[in-house]
């Protein structure tokens, strides 16, 4: 297949809370799963190192061979080594969600690696989240889908109301394991900080892409990201992506960036090198999962977006959402 080099164009309180808790979301009401506040990484994770951090730039990453059992499950050679062309100049990173303390340490490292480049925090979570007293907390529904069906504007409005009502109140926050509510703690909320404010407090820019956990993003989010990439000089920006765990939604947009910046690298090599630096292997869809259809769509779409970006002229003239609608109609 002929490779098409992507063209970048430089750029230029209580009553409210009570009502929100009763309201929940339409998706939650339908499933019978009552949403709640959850610690993003456990009761004490804010005291531990930030999880799933990787920096893809020269001298900052390591390719870790896949576990042989996982490689067999994915249909891969456990000894395979991907092409690393372009990795040294990707200038991207990824991680799980961060507490205030995590973010301050991360910001220092990003500045060192960015070396004067403009830094963007790319938030790949649609679900509501904020820092309560510096600790990352989110609004959790079944499968982490409390905001299922919402637009980004609707999600952000709910997030602002829900979390904005918390200062001066006591709120119960839970741990979650395997979609089950676990240990809880009461928090007397003194401060609430939203992620955009956190990013800007370090002088960084902020971009939010609506993507539901475990899932392929809304097609409009892919449009949004590709349009964003048209407005920046890829050699003069550093992009830090994150979601909740930092393994899948983060991986999607890190991989799309790689595809756009390195059009001569094969799909298979891009997928493998991201899996070997900390991402989930996106082409694999677990057929035994009870959301196998969600994983199957994600696996299909990541390949299709590669094809879209490599179809001569497509990405410069046709939005991804229109292109994929045409493919689905065939």
Model regions and ranges:
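Intrinsically disordered, low-complexity Ser/Thr/Pro-rich tracts
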Residues: 207, 244-245
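Cys-dependent protein tyrosine phosphatase-like superfamily
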Residues: 26-239, 252-330
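Bacterial N-terminal signal peptides that target proteins for export
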Residues: 3-14
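Bacterial N-terminal signal peptides
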Residues: 14-24
């Amino acid at each position: 297949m002929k490779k098409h080099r992507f063209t970048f164009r430089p750029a230029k309180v209580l009553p409210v809370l009570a009502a929100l808790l009763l309201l929940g979301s339409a998706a939650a009401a339908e499933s019978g799963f009552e949403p709640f506040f959850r610690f993003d990484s456990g009761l004490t994770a804010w005291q531990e190192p930030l999880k799933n951090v990787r920096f893809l730039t020269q001298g900052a990453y390591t390719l870790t061979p896949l576990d042989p059992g996982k490689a067999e499950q994915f249909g891969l050679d456990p000894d395979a080594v991907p092409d690393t062309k372009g990795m040294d100049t990707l200038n991207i990173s990824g991680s799980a969600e961060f507490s205030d303390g995590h973010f301050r340490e991360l910001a220092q490292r990003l500045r060192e690696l960015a070396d004067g480049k403009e830094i963007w925090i790319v938030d790949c979570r649609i679900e509501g989240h904020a820092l309560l007293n510096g600790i990352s907390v989110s609004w959790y529904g079944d499968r982490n889908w409390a905001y299922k069906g919402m637009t980004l504007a609707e999600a952000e409005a709910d997030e602002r109301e829900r979390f904005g009502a918390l200062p001066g109140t006591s709120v119960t926050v839970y741990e979650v394991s395997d979609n089950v509510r676990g240990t809880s703690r009461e928090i007397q909320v003194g401060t609430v900080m939203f992620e955009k404010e956190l990013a800007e407090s370090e002088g960084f820019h902020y971009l939010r892409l609506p993507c539901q956990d475990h899932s392929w993003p809304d097609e409009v989010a892919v449009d949004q990201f590709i349009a964003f990439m048209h407005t920046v000089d890829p050699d003069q920006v550093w992009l830090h992506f994150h979601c909740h765990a930092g393994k899948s939604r983060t991986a999607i947009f890190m991989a799309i960036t790689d595809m756009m910046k390195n059009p001569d690298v094969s799909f298979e090599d891009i997928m493998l090198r991201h899996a070997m630096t900390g991402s989930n292997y996106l082409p694999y869809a677990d057929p035994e999962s009870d959301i196998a259809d969600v994983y199957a769509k994600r696996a299909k779409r990541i390949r299709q977006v590669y094809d879209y970006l490599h179809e001569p002229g497509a990405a410069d003239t046709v939005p991804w959402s229109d292109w994929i609608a045409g493919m689905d109609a065939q």
